[in-house]
Amino acid sequence: MEQQKIPQATAKRLPLYYRFIQNLSLSGKQRVSSAELSEAVKVDSATIRRDFSYFGALGKKGYGYNVNYLLSFFRETLDQDDITRVALIGVGNLGTAFLHYNFTKNNNTKIEMAFDISEEKVGTEIGGIPVYHLDELEERLSSDIQVAILTVPATVAQSVADRLAETNVHGILNFTPARLNVSDNIRIHHIDLAVELQTLVYFLKNYPQ
């Protein structure tokens, strides 16, 4: 996907398209129009056509898109056959939920290990995932783990990120309110659930449908 040099906004929508196309394929549907895609994923059809245009001719005018072809294309584009191994740091309520879920709908993403400081959790398995002490972070993180999920208290998020920067981790999904400072070779996606909720409430009050 990096080699395509597509806009980041488009890249963020690709997994959404892929998930819907997977469902279409499972239902036996052979083709789909941009209008049908638009209705399903709540992205306007012009944006979908523009997103798809970055990859060449994925469909035919008047016919739409071949579902099996799209499925194969996005599977390759999103590296669905390559497993991305993930570490989770912080086994609180949210972290525990992630361990039980473990992205079962994503064939190419899997949490391999978790870290915490709680004596009750260290040395156990949650959702089949081993939980190690945070002191063992650098020792336990193998070279093939390149993504980390942070669900630690905000007060320690930066120090954990600093330690991750010394490993082979190149991507951090940050669920803490802290805004982290890391080197340019590490990509961070911030997901602040409180901010998202406040934004939703604001839109409900000020932009009623």
Curated annotation (Swiss-Prot):
User: Which keywords belong to this entry?
Assistant: Cytoplasm, DNA-binding, NAD, Repressor, Transcription, Transcription regulation
Q: Does the keyword DNA-binding apply?
A: yes
Tell me a GO biological process for this protein. negative regulation of DNA-templated transcription
Instruction: Name the domain of life.
Output: Bacteria
One family from Pfam that matches here is: Put_DNA-bind_N
In which residue ranges does the UniProt entry place its DNA-binding region annotation?
16-55
Specify whether DNA-binding is a keyword of the entry: yes
GO MF terms, alphabetically ordered? DNA binding; DNA-binding transcription factor activity
Provide the binding site for NAD(+). 90-95
Q: One Gene Ontology cellular component annotation?
A: cytoplasm
Q: Where is this protein primarily located?
A: cytoplasm
Q: Where in the cell is it found?
A: Cytoplasm
The entry sums up its family as follows: Belongs to the transcriptional regulatory Rex family.
Q: What the protein does?
A: Modulates transcription in response to changes in cellular NADH/NAD(+) redox state.
Subunit composition and interactions: Homodimer.
Q: Which NCBIfam families match?
A: PRK05472.1-3, PRK05472.1-5, PRK05472.2-3, PRK05472.2-4, PRK05472.2-5
Q: What name goes with this protein?
A: Redox-sensing transcriptional repressor Rex
Q: Which gene encodes it?
A: rex
